[in-house]
Structures are given as C-alpha cells and as structure tokens.
C-alpha cells in the first residue's frame, strides 16, 4: 500500500498500477474545505532524497466523497483516507462525514499545524494527541491510525498517548535545500518534508 501523499487519490496512478493488486489505497490528505497548498516551487531533489512542501493541496471532503470514493469502490482493495485539519473541529467534521461512507480506515495526520494553538503540530503535544484521538474514537466506528510526526524530542511519549487502532510511522522529516550560488531557498516555503527519492 502506498504512503499517503505519494499516490494522490488512486485515480492518478490507476493507468500505471493495478489497484486490485494493492492491499489498500491510502489517499492524500483530505480536509474539510479545499486547500490550495503552498506556492511553487514545492518539490526539489536533494542528494539524499526529496524535499516536498506541497501543503496538503486537496479539493476538500465534498469533492472527495462525490468523485474519489466512487472511483475507488470499483477496485478490490481497501480504502484508507488520510484526514488533515487545522483545528480539532476540522478533523471531527471530516471524520464524521467519512464515517457515513464505505471507506475502511482513517489515517489521522496529526503533523498538521494547530492554528488554534499557535501553529504547533497536533502531534507534538502528548495531551493533544490523546485528546484528539479520544474525540475521534467517540464519533466513528471505523478503525483509525494516527500518523505521527518525527519532529519531536521523544516519539515514544507521543506513541504512548495514542489510543488508536494503530500508528503510522512517520511523516516526513523537516528539511531544506539552499541554492548556494543564488543564496536562495529551493522551495518557496523555505522548508519542506525530507523523504527518500
């Protein structure tokens, strides 16, 4: 199964990969409302992989339910939806909507910045991780996986705070690439997520 954010919503790769051969399709992040993402350039190769600063661009939950779920239902594979948000309310509303659909599992991306609490990622505070997990479990019967951020001092403390069905390790590591000749950042957002190539 592909990692979230690497495979779109499945449609983008269905001409190249037989989705029936995958144990599951993990979608890119889906938010309550459409997100435009970050300005370009968003992706840059590095000597050790790739920096991406896409910014969770997506059309929002309404379009996802109307367009992407019916497409994915055509295949004999599980559907895991990555959920993103900027507030606890955002997460809960998306989870509530997805609970009424045929998706098999929800992956909660707690690497998102919490705009209600100064922009720190939800997944960097154990009490917030515990709170958001318990609130989500109250409103959905679907299994949930909490996608943890590596950008913490002690990930074991965060993992112990998660009372989900599973955890997803890990989101990308914060990194940057600088063009030393031009003395400029290579991605418009300055930093992005460092992953393998």
What are these regions (language model features)?
Residues 1-79, 84-86:
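N-terminal capping/small domains of soluble enzymes
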Residues 15, 86-197:
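Alpha/beta enzyme core
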């Amino acid at each position: 199964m592909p990692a979230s954010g690497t495979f779109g919503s499945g449609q983008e790769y269905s001409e190249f990969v037989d989705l029936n051969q995958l144990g599951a399709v993990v979608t890119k992040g889906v938010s309550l409302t459409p997100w435009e993402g970050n300005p370009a350039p968003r992706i840059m190769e590095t000597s050790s992989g790739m920096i991406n600063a896409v910014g969770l661009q997506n059309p929002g939950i309404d379009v996802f339910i109307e367009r992407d779920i019916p497409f994915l239902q055509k295949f004999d594979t599980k559907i895991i939806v990555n959920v993103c948000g900027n507030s606890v309310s955002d997460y809960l509303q998306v989870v509530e909507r997805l609970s009424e659909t045929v998706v098999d599992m929800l992956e909660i991306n707690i690497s998102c910045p919490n705009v209600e609490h100064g922009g720190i990622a939800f997944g960097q505070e154990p009490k917030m991780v515990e709170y958001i997990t318990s609130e989500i479990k109250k409103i959905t019967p679907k299994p949930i996986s909490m996608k943890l951020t590596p950008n913490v001092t002690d990930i074991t403390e965060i993992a112990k705070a998660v009372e989900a069905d599973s955890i997803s390790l890990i989101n990308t590591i914060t990194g940057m690439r600088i063009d030393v000749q031009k003395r400029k950042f290579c991605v418009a957002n300055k930093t992005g997520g460092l992953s393998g190539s």
